[in-house]
Amino acid sequence: MKRARFEDDFNPVYPYEHYNPLDIPFITPPFASSNGLQEKPPGVLSLKYTDPLTTKNGALTLKLGTGLNIDKNGDLSSDASVEVSAPITKTNKIVGLNYTKPLALQNNALTLSYNAPFNVVNNNLALNMSQPVTINANNELSLLIDAPLNADTGTLRLRSDAPLGLVDKTLKVLFSSPLYLDNNFLTLAIERPLALSSNRAVALKYSPPLKIENENLTLSTGGPFTVSGGNLNLATSAPLSVQNNSLSLGVNPPFLITDSGLAMDLGDGLALGGSKLIINLGPGLQMSNGAITLALDAALPLQYKNNQLQLRIGSASALIMSGVTQTLNVNANTSKGLAIENNSLVVKLGNGLRFDSWGSIAVSPTTTTPTTLWTTADPSPNATFYESLDAKVWLVLVKCNGMVNGTISIKAQKGTLLKPTASFISFVMYFYSDGTWRKNYPVFDNEGILANSATWGYRQGQSANTNVSNAVEFMPSSKRYPNEKGSEVQNMALTYTFLQGDPNMAISFQSIYNHAIEGYSLKFTWRVRNNERFDIPCCSFSYVTEQ
């Protein structure tokens, strides 16, 4: 290689003075190698190195990261700690491994200790097995089973039917009397007439009239007993018979059956004297030669004449003997207030008269027609709107000639009525065609009715007579207020009232008569103020009556 020519003023002694590095000629000695050496900058021979080598204070050294240092002997060392977790351990800066049986260290290698039925096949742990143990299609250890065993729930179980069953996890025979266990053997408890024969079979001991016929127990019979349809019967003839599965004796009067036995029904004049039937004679009668004769002295107005007992009748006694049988009768003047009724002389009473409790003639009191139907003056909670007995209702109907004047008021007691949210609330009453109260009639939402336990009847003082059998005269006229026309004005009356009696809470009050499809009905409807207690003061209404 031809060397470059130096400038005349170039000083070849390092370091070069004031020359542009690019102008310095290549003057590397021919003995310098490019392996580990380089000319950098140009004209300067230097070491060629990469990380982690570097220079420090003109000396070649190493770049040291965290945990590395050079000790005083110039050796590279580390003060970094190695963190380990179980089963790896670190003792005196030596990393180890914790293990327990069946793991073991053999020839500096970790191995597994095992016993039968385990085995190692092709460097894999295997299990020696024989039937019924097997490996199923899912490579799971399984058990070959057959009935009565099953493993549907993952547990090997024994299927059993009565009389076999599990008791305290033990297969047992289930039994009840007369079976019992005797020295762990199932035994039959027997009592006479059962017994064990010589061949250990259960036999029946019997004696006449029982007998064995065609290997069946039967009964020897003689008259009056017979066997029919497998039943023992008793042949009977009158007066004996079988009634209600009991032997009975047929009797005709005067015989009868009592708790103590057969008896005779004795009428007047007959009696029992010891064990004999005798005639019971009263005063004036006697037995003479086996016949009944009179034994009396006749006192007036009776007389005994010609073997006959006779009655003497005066001409002014109002008594007469009439008819073929000569019956004694009273000669009553029926046009003068007397009459014969049920063989008794009675007084005939005209209008306005009656017999009092002492049997005396008295003037009949004037009949008073009820004029008021009501729920009493102060009822208990008696109406149901949203829940049972959630309100108290005062309803009064007063009959006045051809009109009824009525009033109604309501006091909320509980539930929804204390804070109602509906637009309107109604109270309805239904009546049958005879004007009697109709209970359990279906109602719609936001409608109330009297509860079945409520009192409704004619006013009787401050209470009510609930014996109302006909109250048509109190009902709305079916001509003036036709049925099923409750939505038409002819059946309505409309006015206003004040909720809770507060003049600042005016609400509408509507009365509708005979809105139901049959019978009679009353319906009262009020507008609701939202969440305001539904207390309605006394509201008046009137209508034309049926009668």
From Swiss-Prot:
Record remark: domains: The tail region anchors the fiber to penton base capsomers, whereas the shaft, built from several repeated motifs, allows the knob to protrude from the virion.
Protein name per Swiss-Prot or TrEMBL: Fiber protein 1
Superkingdom to which the source organism belongs: Viruses
GO cellular component: host cell nucleus; viral capsid
InterPro entries: Adeno_fibre (IPR000931), Adeno_fibre_knob (IPR000978), Adenobir_fibre_prot_rpt/shaft (IPR000939), Adenovirus_pIV-like_att (IPR008982), Attachment_protein_shaft_sf (IPR009013)
Origin species: Human adenovirus F serotype 40
Membership in a protein family: Belongs to the adenoviridae fiber family.
Gene induction: Expressed in the late phase of the viral replicative cycle.
Subcellular location as annotated: Virion; Host nucleus
Extent of the signal sequence: none
Biological processes per GO annotation: adhesion receptor-mediated virion attachment to host cell; cell adhesion; symbiont entry into host cell
